[in-house]
Regions:
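Non-catalytic alpha-helical scaffolds and adjoining flexible linkers that form interface surfaces
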Residues: 1-141
């Protein structure tokens, strides 16, 4: 809820989709100090909440995670050290997620296999690059 307006009703989400949003919450708690003002992260969360009203909440939560990481200085699209870690299609999808403009249509389709590959990569990225073990790891799989 924001300024008396319900952004989207998380209680209507499936268990799997809600777990993805818990992932976003856990990510924010891991990356951003409590009580410290962080306008970019706030803007990402607000835009994601608005977008989740009308679009796939699981995909929106994943896009928000990518954007939050980049805003915190951990851009998963730039830090692909091992080019074999992701297929070309998954790398392209990850870059399209990173560049997505809230409120605009998403360019192209999202294959389940490529999305799953990106989700596995994100969990590894958080563990290896950010030194963060997520309790909700695997939420997007």
């Amino acid at each position: 809820q924001y300024e008396g307006r319900l952004l989207f009703d998380m209680m209507k989400l499936s268990y799997e989709d809600m777990t993805c949003w818990y992932y976003v919450i856990e990510l924010v708690l891991a990356l951003y100090p409590v009580g410290q003002k962080e306008d970019e992260a706030y803007d990402i969360l607000m835009a994601a909440a608005r977008a989740a009203e009308e679009r796939n909440p699981r995909v929106i939560a994943f896009i928000a995670s990518i954007k939050l990481l980049a805003a915190a200085g951990y851009d998963p699209t730039e830090a692909i050290e091992d080019p074999t870690a992701l297929s070309e299609g998954a790398r392209d999808l990850l870059c399209r997620f990173r560049g997505y403009r809230w409120g605009s249509p998403f360019e192209g389709s999202i294959s389940r296999a490529l999305f799953t590959e990106c989700a596995r990569y994100l969990d590894q990225f958080l563990s290896n690059v950010c030194d963060t073990e997520m309790k909700t790891a695997g939420a997007f799989l």
